[in-house]
């Protein structure tokens, strides 16, 4: 399982080959990335020429933005994905709990380092005694499920008492209005790791920058595992500018709240029950593959989950894209009931 290829959203090259539609003709709604990205100011020439210096500035700004206990509790990384792959090697072998439908990199990252896996019930107050670790996204990708901080801290206490740890991936939390749901301020606690990403809310997935928040001793080991220069000079410039622009952040949260509600309402109007964050809607429906395939035939790419038939749809960027999605749904949804009864070849996405 650990060595199986993992497919993510945003794979337009694959979509173009499969459906015979040129790459630039696609409307890509397959990710939960903000389509209204932060306008990065011009990058200074030195950011390109010089090696990035670990002067603590980026960690200090991140600590203020995320409300972490301090800069010593923050490690800049090349996207939270880098930390997800590296962290399991720092823990003694055990059993990790992962939600049945979650980010597809979690379980393989732990399996790669000899850990076993078990399903995680995000509604449970008490974790199974067999679990040593748990990794949970809050809100979850793709189901949009949220776990309240009281339950998360209860889980953390249970796991630490067993010599384990809790990892909370808050990659999609920046767009949420309730900052108090974050555990970033609690990362002085041993056995707690919080992962944050600038790719989703700020729409800067291409800069590959994120942060691991934890006790300094664990971050020192993670720093050694990842090596030097994990975040490039241009990426540091972009992230610092994004953190400093509080007015943009406030306006964008309001815009995404509106757009996220609009997308959920549009899908409901076409007969799909949805669970949503401000950045995407998710629907578990027998017609999920038929919907994914029908939209793809019209050049609209979504994220289909084959092992738990469901589809995730991200935000359109502008009015033309909204109309294109609405027209495609109106044209194809009436045919989906029949299409859903026909067998489909296995889809590699998961």
List PLM regions with ranges.
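PLP-dependent aminotransferase class I/II
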Residues: 191-267, 272-273
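Conserved PLP-binding catalytic core of the aspartate aminotransferase-like
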Residues: 257, 265-298, 315
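Conserved beta-loop-alpha segment that forms the PLP phosphate-binding cup at the N-terminus of a helix
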Residues: 71-96, 106, 210
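Short beta-strand
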Residues: 28, 76, 195, 272-277, ...
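Active-site phosphate-binding strand-loop segment of PLP-dependent enzymes
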Residues: 118-176
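N-terminal "arm"/small-domain region of PLP-dependent enzymes with the aminotransferase-like
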Residues: 1-56, 61
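PLP-dependent enzyme catalytic core of the Aspartate aminotransferase-like
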Residues: 150, 297, 307-350
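Conserved PLP-anchoring active-site segment centered on the Schiff-base-forming lysine
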Residues: 88-111, 116-119, 123-124
């Amino acid at each position: 399982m650990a060595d199986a290829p993992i497919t993510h959203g945003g794979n337009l090259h694959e979509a173009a080959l499969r459906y015979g539609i040129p790459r630039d003709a696609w409307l890509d709604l397959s990710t939960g990335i903000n389509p209204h990205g932060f306008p990065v100011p011009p990058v200074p020439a030195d950011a390109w020429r010089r090696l990035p210096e670990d002067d603590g500035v980026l960690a200090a700004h991140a600590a203020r933005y995320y409300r972490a206990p301090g800069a010593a509790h923050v490690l800049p990384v090349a996207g939270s994905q880098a930390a997800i792959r590296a962290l399991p090697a720092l823990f003694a072998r055990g059993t990790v709990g992962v939600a049945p439908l979650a980010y597809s990199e979690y379980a393989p990252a732990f399996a790669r380092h000899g850990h076993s896996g078990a399903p995680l019930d995000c509604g449970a107050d008490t974790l199974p005694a067999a679990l040593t670790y748990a990794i949970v996204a809050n809100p979850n990708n793709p189901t949009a499920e949220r776990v309240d901080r009281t339950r998360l801290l209860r889980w953390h206490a249970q796991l630490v008492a067993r010599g384990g740890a809790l990892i909370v991936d808050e990659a999609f939390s920046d767009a949420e209005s309730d900052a108090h749901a974050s555990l970033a301020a609690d990362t002085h606690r041993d056995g707690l790791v919080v992962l944050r990403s600038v790719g989703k809310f700020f729409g800067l997935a291409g800069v590959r920058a994120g942060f691991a928040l934890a006790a300094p001793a664990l971050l020192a080991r993670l720093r050694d595992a990842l090596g030097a220069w994990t975040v490039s000079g241009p990426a540091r410039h972009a992230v610092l500018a994004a953190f400093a622009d509080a007015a943009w952040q406030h306006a964008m949260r309001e815009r995404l709240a509106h757009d996220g509600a609009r997308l959920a309402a549009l899908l409901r109007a076409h007969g799909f029950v949805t669970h949503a964050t401000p950045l995407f809607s998710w629907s578990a429906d027998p017609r999920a593959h038929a919907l994914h395939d029908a939209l793809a035939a019209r050049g609209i790419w979504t994220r289909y989950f084959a092992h738990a038939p469901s589809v995730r749809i991200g935000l359109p960027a502008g009015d033309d894209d909204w109309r294109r999605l609405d027209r495609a749904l109106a044209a194809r949804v009436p045919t989906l009931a029949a299409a859903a009864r026909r067998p489909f070849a296995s889809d590699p996405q998961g």
